[in-house]
A protein has these predicted regions:
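Hydrophobic recognition helices of helix-based DNA-binding modules
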Residues: 1-8, 150, 154
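Short, surface-exposed, charge-dense and proline/glycine-enriched linear segments
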Residues: 36-53, 78-83, 101-107, 155-160, ...
């Protein structure tokens, strides 16, 4: 993973045409779009008000959570979880599959899903952050990314996975 993150661009955004000068300039429109869609789905009775409330509380803290600038536009997988890691003989990582939302971004964006499914059990996020460093508010950023990603998936696919979403809205 670190090898992927070592691929850099001078701009943030889509791998084919990164065009944003900062990570927040890239991420905030996505954040606003997902939040607006979530509010509408909640008003229509399709999304729990508790989820939108958690999003509102997180959004109120956005400037604080993301106060430390991201200087490096790193290539990220965008959907990295334990199910997308290919492992060969001797438990050697042989590849990654399903690079949904691959882009030049905050490298920590790639880490939030390591705390989903069974990923936390393997200490993948903790190991990466200890080895390569973490931003000052990495834990809060990862929770923010996770919440927005799960709601984004609901907006696109219409399905929530309770054992992933429930810890995010507490």
């Amino acid at each position: 993973l670190h090898g992927i993150h070592e691929c850099r661009s001078d701009k943030f955004g889509d791998t084919m045409n990164p065009q944003f000068s900062s990570w927040l300039e890239c991420y905030e429109p996505f954040m606003d779009e997902v939040y607006s869609a979530a509010k509408q789905l909640s008003e229509d009775g399709q999304l729990s008000p508790e989820i939108v409330s958690a999003m509102s509380r997180a959004r109120d803290k956005f400037q604080n959570i993301f106060s430390q600038p991201v200087y490096d536009a790193c290539l990220i997988h965008g959907d990295l979880n334990v199910g997308n890691i290919m492992v060969g003989k001797g438990l050697r990582i042989t590849g990654f599959i399903d690079p949904l939302n691959s882009m030049y971004a905050d490298r920590e964006y790639d880490l939030f899903q390591f705390n989903n499914l069974t990923g936390k059990r393997f200490f993948l996020c903790d190991t990466y952050l200890k080895k390569y460093g973490a931003s000052e508010k990495a834990e809060q950023k990862l929770a923010f990314y996770a919440l927005w990603n799960e709601v984004y998936c609901f907006v696109k696919a219409g399905t929530l996975i309770p054992f992933i979403m429930n810890p995010l809205v507490k």
